[in-house]
A protein has these predicted regions:
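Hydrophobic alpha-helical transmembrane segments of multi-pass integral membrane proteins
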Residues: 1-124
């Protein structure tokens, strides 16, 4: 699972960097907030998840796959919602809100994984 998190992190970084280049070339910065979500929540969070799952082998069971799917969906839905909203389309506003909620659920799942596996990993 750690390797999948690392690869996902790299994909988010590449997409965010592509958005940054596009914004710079066009002088159109409406995608800025979506780019930040992709860098911070996509690249940063998935890199942290991967590092944790690689370091704490006991965390590789249980909720980890579910957490990955929830976190992935949350980042994508929030970024798409932010971009659509910033481009003036109110249709995307619920996606931004729902995506942020899903991201928060992903963080709660990660916290549960961390606190549930901490004792197990410490006693190996």
């Amino acid at each position: 699972m750690a390797s999948l998190c690392f690869r996902t992190s790299v994909v988010f970084a590449l997409v965010a960097a592509g958005l940054a280049l596009w914004m710079t070339a066009t002088h159109d910065y409406r995608a800025l907030h979506a780019e930040v979500v992709l860098f911070v929540l996509g690249w940063g969070s998935f890199m942290a998840y991967g590092l944790y799952y690689r370091t704490i082998a006991a965390a590789a069971a249980g909720l980890v796959k579910f957490h990955y799917v929830v976190a992935l969906i949350g980042v994508i839905v929030e970024a798409v919602g932010i971009m659509g909203t910033e481009w003036g389309n109110p249709f995307f506003d619920p996606f931004r809100i729902i995506g942020a909620f899903i991201v928060a659920v992903g963080f709660v799942l990660f916290a549960i994984i961390v606190f549930a596996t901490r004792e197990t990993a410490a006693h190996r």
